[in-house]
Amino acid sequence: VTDDSSDPTPCSSCTPVDPICTDCTITVIPQLPLISITKDGTLDMGADGIANAGDVITYNFVVTNTGNVTLSNVVVNDPLLGLSAIAVTPGTLLPGAVGTASATYTITQDDIDAGQVDNLAVATGTDPNGDPITDDSSDPTPCPSCTPIDPTCTDCTIVEINQNPSIAIVKEATFNDNNGDGFPQAGETITYTFTVTNTGNMSLFDVIVTDPLPGIVLTGGPIDLAVGQSDSTTFTATYTITQADIVFGSVVNQATASAETIDGEVVDDLSDDDSELEDDPTIVILEGCKLTIFNAVSPNGDGSNDIFYIQGIECYPNNTVEVYNRWGIKVYEVNNY
């Protein structure tokens, strides 16, 4: 005598795996479909070791089936990379199994100015019932000193970008021989031109040039400079030579270029006369007229040595000329000769 079993406490909501086994005892096994993902990023700054627009971050994704059912069609979606359905290998994960994926992101100047790249990825798998299972990524090696750009994104993967703001200025001078005699005199002018260059890896704003030379008239600015950009036309200055400069024999000084980053950090540089790499003052040598006294005079009207000529005397208008005879007696004196 035989009998098939029946379930004294049948599951009213269950459907037997075999539809004809209506008396089967069904033991419900709780399903817990879960997935997790970590996202780690590494920036390759290239041979120069400085972050530049165009450098690449490589992201590695590790996806784990943390539930108790098999997950299929496992993929990663990443809005930063503009990618969806990044393939995970393997694409089907048994409970406890791990899959991996990778992708790259090319950094922009905005990323460098921000000093970091933040974002989340999402892992998605399908459970045996056809339902999607998702998880937002976390960073397996978080930056302890970093603050996410979006304060609510506490699980964002943050890739730090080294910032190196800097500026350089070159100051060049041209003596304007205003009266055309070939010699500098008080009242003539020097024109200065300034070339400012963004030599760092951050955008620079409110670039200005200052020059402490007393009496200099400086115009131009402020301007902004993109990374690598130079400007040699905005800033110019004019200086009027003084008699003290003539006596000293030169005009020596330096200007300063300063700017701010998007974060308000101030960078500056002392000018060089011909290089972005040094800080040498700009020097204008003032070689004044040389006096040559011709002491032979023959005022006979023959056109040769008819007058007492002192070459270069015109450079010294406030002069006094005295003539002595062979016995040391002054025989002639005149001012402003």
Predicted regions and their residues:
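Short loop/turn motifs at secondary-structure boundaries
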Residues: L286-Y337
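Exported/extracytosolic protein signature
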Residues: V1-K290
